[in-house]
């Protein structure tokens, strides 16, 4: 008896053992990510390489909160599921039976539960799982979690901290230090590195660099030039990562490095044996950015920059080339340096400031953890770059002592604390009686966002009969019970503060939401989308508009009129979340529909940039790519999927054909269902996904049909079809910059799978 098609058919050469033993436990692990998008792809690759050898199937559902129905079929045939926080939240809202199948929830980069809107979502998702699925084990992983025992006590109060495991061992020794200049400027200066903390300097390396007056100023003076000079110094020891806090800094450091290289006798890093690999990389990047783009040229010298506005396929190429050794120095933001396992010998910290705020000690140490290739190096180097002697002292004092890493604090607890300060006019002391205070509605933007996210999450979890009750005390009691299970409730209790003020605050706001949405069916429809209240109301209005249009023009559902139907849906999609992102930087909302149509039609990034750069005020092609990434593939796909859900549940419109896959078309930039299927399985090159889909001989295949056909094709045949490297599906990350936090989940068999296996 054959098994159902595997979601990762490209690994067919790794023969899986037969799943014939009914006693063999079936699990599916879903991974919810908080680090940059590259990490989840790497996690899935490594999990698949190990677990598929023992018959466990690894799948991924990346992206934001868009609902792509066919992708949920992966859940029926998977053991380990890699998902984003947003995606897991959406799955639990729309597929409640999934919760009962969870067995293990593994949260990588677990410190991402810290104070932020994303941290709040992770906290409430884990709370929901703890309440509804007590059999599921939850494990948080982090290298920068100083209050791990506190988090462990929240996850399992009865364990009394025995469920906390701390491992100090590291496969390589990490040397951390600060680079600074010494000497009088008029005489020239020498740059040295002091390794160790302010109290305990391990050793001192003098004269790493020298600088002299050139005309009227010292060179190198700017941080970018100092970082470039240090990169050339350390590159002789192994790969270098220049960690920056903003995309502009990453680009500036790479340009400075290129300028410094051009002044040397050998303006190329690495050996001659890497030239062919770099030339091929340059050609691949040129396909996306053009032959004249600076990245196309930089990579031939063994250097590059990496940040979130670079097109996703180009980021994948850069990551793989860095891992393979073709790139020797990579200048990157935290999008790459947080959590990703990289072959880094030295991390140079270019700056510790972002938007006039100094980055946290936790962020520094998380980036520092990239240094020292496991089992390849005996030690790694992390060097902070100081502007002057005083800056060096400050950096050493703040960052080099790991005891300074900030504890992870709940967003819910932080919301309570800050609102209490607003009410009291001072910080509440531990043990202070706060039972009778009334928390005010927030005025600051971040607190308002937190409060709105919290009330929507609570509204999702509270039973309808409780939400609609006229008994305010009953609603407060229900809110209190939910909040007590959150990390915030745990940490508020540790301060010996009453949870009642927060319960009253949230109950009041949830009741107000319910009054704004008196129709339970409309309320449920909005909550399934994950939109804000206003966004949900906008989606209901848009769905009614589309439904009325279809009533007046039923012929729009005919396959021949698909472009008109597509534009009808896209034009109606003006929900709040989309309006905000689409009109950012004074861009016109009118650009969304035509650009989305061209994106789906297969226009290349270069073609879209050439046509829309004036309309989008996009000076560089990466700005156009960023617009597509944030507006089209995330927010528009989310908005359209929400409208389609409401069309189906409230208007009874059966979603078939291309209309059902429109969110996936927007997400992946392809125009057929089979091409969407291919992209969902990890073929992130749009042309490759389209080409492979065209080879499928099955007319109008379902997702199962397509994966079954692909499963029967040998890996060399798939590779030949794609005209690409031997691992065409290796980089499967579809994460966006909105994706934060990583989970691994173990799922028991779906009922139909259980029957199938029993029949075997």
Predicted regions and their residues:
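Conserved interdomain linker/interface between the two RecA-like ATPase lobes of SF2 helicase motors
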Residues: 127, 136-256
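Conserved P-loop/Walker A NTP-binding site and adjacent catalytic elements of P-loop NTPases
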Residues: 1-142, 149-157, 162-168, 241-244, ...
């Amino acid at each position: 008896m054959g098994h159902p098609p595997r979601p990762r058919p490209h690994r067919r050469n790794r023969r899986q053992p037969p799943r014939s033993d009914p006693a063999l436990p079936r699990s599916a692990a879903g991974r919810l990510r908080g680090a940059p998008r590259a990490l989840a792809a790497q996690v899935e690759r490594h999990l698949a390489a190990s677990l598929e050898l023992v018959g466990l199937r690894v799948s991924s559902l990346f992206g934001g909160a868009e609902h792509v129905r066919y992708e949920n079929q992966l859940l029926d045939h998977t053991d380990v599921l890699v998902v984003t926080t947003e995606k897991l939240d959406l799955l639990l809202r729309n597929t409640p039976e999934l919760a009962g199948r969870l067995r293990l929830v593994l949260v990588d980069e677990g410190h991402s539960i810290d104070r932020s809107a994303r941290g709040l979502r992770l906290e409430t998702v884990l709370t929901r799982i703890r309440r509804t699925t007590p059999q599921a084990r939850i494990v948080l992983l982090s290298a920068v979690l100083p209050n791990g025992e506190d988090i462990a006590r929240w996850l399992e109060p009865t364990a009394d901290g025995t469920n906390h495991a701390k491992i100090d061992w590291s496969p390589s020794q990490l040397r951390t230090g600060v680079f600074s200049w010494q000497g009088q400027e008029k005489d020239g200066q020498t740059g040295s590195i002091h390794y160790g903390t302010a109290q305990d300097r391990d050793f001192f390396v003098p004269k790493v660099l020298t600088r002299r007056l050139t005309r009227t100023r010292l060179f190198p003076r700017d941080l970018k030039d100092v970082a470039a000079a240090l990169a050339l110094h350390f590159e002789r020891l192994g790969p270098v990562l220049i960690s920056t806090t903003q995309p502009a800094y990453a680009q500036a450091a790479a340009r400075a490095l290129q300028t410094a290289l051009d002044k040397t006798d050998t303006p190329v890093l690495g050996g001659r044996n890497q030239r062919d690999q770099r030339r091929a990389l340059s050609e691949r990047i040129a396909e996306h950015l053009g032959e004249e783009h600076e990245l196309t040229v930089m990579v031939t010298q063994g250097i590059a920059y990496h940040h979130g506005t670079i097109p996703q396929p180009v980021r994948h190429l850069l990551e793989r080339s860095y891992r393979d050794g073709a790139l020797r120095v990579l200048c990157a933001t935290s999008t790459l340096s947080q959590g990703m396992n990289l072959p880094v010998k030295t991390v140079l910290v270019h700056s510790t400031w972002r938007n006039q705020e100094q980055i946290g000690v936790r962020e520094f140490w998380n980036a520092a953890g990239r240094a020292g290739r496991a089992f390849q190096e005996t030690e790694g180097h992390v060097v902070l770059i100081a502007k002057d002697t005083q800056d060096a002292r400050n950096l050493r004092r703040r960052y080099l002592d790991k005891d300074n890493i900030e504890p992870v604090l709940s967003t819910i607890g932080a919301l309570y604390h800050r609102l209490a300060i607003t009410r009291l006019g001072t910080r509440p002391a531990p043990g202070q009686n706060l039972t009778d205070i009334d928390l005010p509605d927030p005025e600051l933007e971040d607190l308002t966002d937190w409060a709105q996210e919290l009330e929507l999450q609570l509204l999702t979890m509270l039973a309808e009969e409780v939400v609609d009750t006229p008994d305010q005390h009953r609603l407060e009691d229900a809110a209190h019970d939910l909040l007590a299970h959150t990390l915030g409730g745990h940490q508020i209790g540790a301060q010996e503060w009453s949870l009642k003020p927060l319960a009253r605050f949230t109950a009041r706001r949830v009741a107000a939401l319910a009054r704004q949405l008196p129709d339970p069916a409309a309320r449920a429809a909005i909550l399934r989308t994950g939109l804000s209240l206003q966004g949900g109301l906008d989606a209901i209005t848009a769905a009614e508009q589309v439904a009325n249009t279809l009533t007046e023009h039923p012929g729009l559902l005919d396959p021949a009129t698909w472009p008109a139907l597509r534009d009808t849906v896209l034009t109606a999609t003006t929900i709040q979340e989309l309006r905000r992102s689409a009109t950012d930087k004074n861009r016109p909302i009118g650009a969304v529909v035509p650009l989305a149509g061209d994106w789906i039609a297969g226009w290349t990034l270069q073609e879209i940039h050439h046509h829309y750069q004036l309309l989008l005020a996009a000076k560089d092609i990466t700005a156009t790519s960023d617009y597509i990434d944030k507006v089209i593939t995330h927010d528009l796909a989310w908005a359209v999927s929400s409208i389609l859900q409401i069309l189906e549940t409230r208007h009874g419109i059966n979603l078939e054909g291309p209309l059902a896959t429109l969110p996936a078309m927007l997400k992946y930039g392809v125009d057929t269902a089979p091409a969407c299927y291919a992209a969902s399985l990890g073929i992130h090159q749009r042309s490759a996904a389209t080409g492979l889909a065209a080879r499928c001989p099955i007319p109008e295949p379902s997702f199962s049909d397509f994966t079954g056909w692909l499963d029967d094709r040998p890996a060399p045949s798939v590779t030949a079809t794609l005209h690409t490297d031997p691992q065409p599906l290796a980089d499967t990350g579809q994460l966006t910059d909105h994706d934060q936090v990583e989970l691994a989940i173990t799922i028991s068999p779906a009922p139909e799978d259980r029957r199938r296996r029993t029949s075997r």
